[in-house]
Amino acid sequence: MKAFRSLRILISISRTTTKTTPRNPHQAQNFLRRFYSAQPNLDEPTSINEDGSSSDSVFDSSQYPIDDSNVDSVKKPKEATWDKGYRERVNKAFFGNLTEKGKVKVAEEESSEDDEDSVDRSRILAKALLEAALESPDEELGEGEVREEDQKSLNVGIIGPPNAGKSSLTNFMVGTKVAAASRKTNTTTHEVLGVLTKGDTQVCFFDTPGLMLKKSGYGYKDIKARVQNAWTSVDLFDVLIVMFDVHRHLMSPDSRVVRLIKYMGEEENPKQKRVLCMNKVDLVEKKKDLLKVAEEFQDLPAYERYFMISGLKGSGVKDLSQYLMDQAVKKPWEEDAFTMSEEVLKNISLEVVRERLLDHVHQEIPYGLEHRLVDWKELRDGSLRIEQHLITPKLSQRKILVGKGGCKIGRIGIEANEELRRIMNRKVHLILQVKLK
């Protein structure tokens, strides 16, 4: 009986469940759709980074299509570790200086020798190769190399008022970008080393921040920290180039610039030669006016020579370069003539980004930023990963620097990345992140 009762209960339950179906057959589906649509989509990236900054404030070059046609392949075949010079030295000592016919004759003789002679000859050749490897290197130098006792060197400092064209001249003479060049003042914030090597002579350029003098003869307090190193290093250079914008001087003379030129030209330094460079002569329409400016400063005894140049277009720079080459003294080179040091490349990466920043962001924002190189890593495929942070003290400045939807920092990053790839001739993965202090 109990079995029959339980069977009846099960039948009644099954009948009630079939009658309680929802009126709307899509009701359950709508419920599930509303439920899942309220959940976060975990496959899509979040708009907030781990440090709390918006994703719009980060530029990543890997997310932008960049033309690689002008960049050589970074993957190079592995070179043999054996020095071919040893083989050449052995051939000279073992076979002598053979002509083509002599080489053929030796080859024929070797082929006709018996096995024992071949074994002996191989042993002698192996011994000669080992001796050549153990010998001290001979005095023969590769192409472009100069003996240390024949090397000449010169350290050149370039100073002047802000926006005088010091960075442009440094970049033109060195042949690549080592300092930020912009129309804004106080573009250079630290000394940047550029190296020019020609023949047996190496010239090292030090580009310094713009210097100005008050009536008292001392630097202004608002840029005191920026120019402190420039003033302390003035007397350390072999040659000092004092530069000013001659076009601006003719249009609206600045008494502070005149004081700086006279201050540097009044007292002679027996251990240092000083030259006065009138830059941006290409902007002066009446060339006779240049002679008037030269006469204005001709009585300053510390200046050995006067040069009229255009650091941007290169006019007159050849004469200045030749003068500097002639002033070089016998001294070993301080920098590698064939490769840039990693420190120089790091400075170049900072200066390239800084120049683009000055071109796209106006007012006082670029000068209040803290610009840091956070990561510098060479990847396995030969490319270079560079990460820089731009730290601003104000939220309003951060919004201006980022732009709507990250458009401004994106434009800065794209232009800087393309120029870095061109300068370094390799693939560069540039990451720029704008942060709030």
Curated annotation (Swiss-Prot):
Disordered: annotated span: 39-65
G3, as annotated region: 207-210
Boundaries of every KH type-2 domain copy: 361-437
Region (G4): 279-282
Any one of the GO CC terms: mitochondrion
Region (G2): 186-190
Era-type G domain location: 152-333
Biased composition range(s): Polar residues: 39-50
Record flagged with keyword Acetylation: no
Domain of life: Eukaryota
Key words of the record: GTP-binding, Nucleotide-binding, Phosphoprotein, RNA-binding
Region ranges (G5): 309-311
Low complexity composition-biased segments: 51-62
HAMAP family documented for this protein: GTPase_Era
Descriptive protein name: GTP-binding protein ERG
Taxonomic source organism: Arabidopsis thaliana
Gene designation per UniProt: ERG
